[in-house]
Amino acid sequence: MLFLGAGELGKEVAIELMRLGAWVCAADSYAGAPAQQVAHEYRALDMANAAELQALFDEIKPDIIVPEVEAIATDVLAGTAAAGAQVVPSAEIAAICMDRERLRVLAHEELGLPTTPYRFAGSLEELRAGASEVGYPCVVKPVMSSSGHGQSVVRSADAIDAAWTEAQEGRRAADEGDVSRVIVEALAPLERELTVLTVSSSAGIVTCAPIGQRQESGDYRESWQPATEPDGEAERARDIARTAVEGLVAKAQAAGETGWGVFGVELFVLTDGSILFNEVSPRPHDTGMVTMASQRLSEFALHARAILGLPITPEHVSLTIPAGSVAASHAIVVAGDGEVEFTDVAAALAEPGTDLRIFAKPEVHGHRRMAVALAVGESEADARAKAGLVADALTITVE
């Protein structure tokens, strides 16, 4: 089992796989990444470099490859899948989900899922025309980027040139010189966002209870499950997620791959109550860390079992918290430059119904997610407050 990316989510998946007897090698761009600390072996390399990635595959000869990040040479991944390695969930799905154009065409134009109005553009002139068609305000993104890089909100035609420049500078492989296509989409009247974890396994596709979330600057800060929703919203959200994953898995199986694993389906809930498809992460989702406190099996255990061909049923994704209660997670983001030390852990965990995961990342330069607090409460507000108390009680030193 070879992990491409060895962050905190990969660490939890690696642990679950090792509990089931798997041998794990964890690769990342640096040594000492969280999953490398628990794996049998590790490697450090530039996974977006085709030659380095091919050399890694030639050395390890993995049976199963688990991509945990997006910055991967997908052509090499596809070649290895064609040669017989199992890519999770598939090389084809990884390529589609990295490309907003391919994913949006599949979701809206092939599967008929509701989305914001959008256009694609390969030049500044096409972007101007597309923005005029979808209307202002609108959002401009590179078709290939992650974590909000290259994204901007455009409120008038005067800002289009700057948005084009931002997209080109923030796209994946921006130093390679090619011009990136962009997507421009209408800025929806957003009320909130949901994640629906959806599992494809040898037993078919099942969905988890929707997860609510709060973001800052495009990054996850809190999540809670089950999300508080009006009647019928949860099933509508789960139906959209199931349809999206069914479409992706069909592509994988047509290419001779399994399509097994956990998918994080991201949805928009608008002020009028309608639900729109946004994107899919073909791996465990950061908002899904809350499942370590809420479900029969966490998203990491679900991913591990699905990867190994074990069946996942509705019982495995059921909530195990008391009826009417809510679980919450709170990301602990550290700012500074140097090594990080956590103290006052006992005080942080003094609140009943709470837990903590410290990721043991070696250092921070700027801002970095270093831990997550977990809590179960009688309501969404109670659970979120308890998780926040855990985070606030920690003393964090950067040296």
Curated annotation (Swiss-Prot):
Residues the record lists as binding N(1)-(5-phospho-beta-D-ribosyl)glycinamide: E8, L9, E68, D286, K361, R368, R369
Residues binding ATP: R100, K141, S146, S147, G148, H149, G150, Q151, E185, A186, L187, A188, E193
One Gene Ontology biological process: 'de novo' IMP biosynthetic process
Catalytic activity: N(1)-(5-phospho-beta-D-ribosyl)glycinamide + formate + ATP = N(2)-formyl-N(1)-(5-phospho-beta-D-ribosyl)glycinamide + ADP + phosphate + H(+)
Signal peptide interval: none
Annotated PROSITE patterns: ATP_GRASP (PS50975)
Functional note: Involved in the de novo purine biosynthesis. Catalyzes the transfer of formate to 5-phospho-ribosyl-glycinamide (GAR), producing 5-phospho-ribosyl-N-formylglycinamide (FGAR). Formate is provided by PurU via hydrolysis of 10-formyl-tetrahydrofolate.
HAMAP family the record matches: PurT (MF_01643)
Name of the featured protein: Formate-dependent phosphoribosylglycinamide formyltransferase
Organism expressing this protein natively: Bifidobacterium longum (strain NCC 2705)
Gene: purT
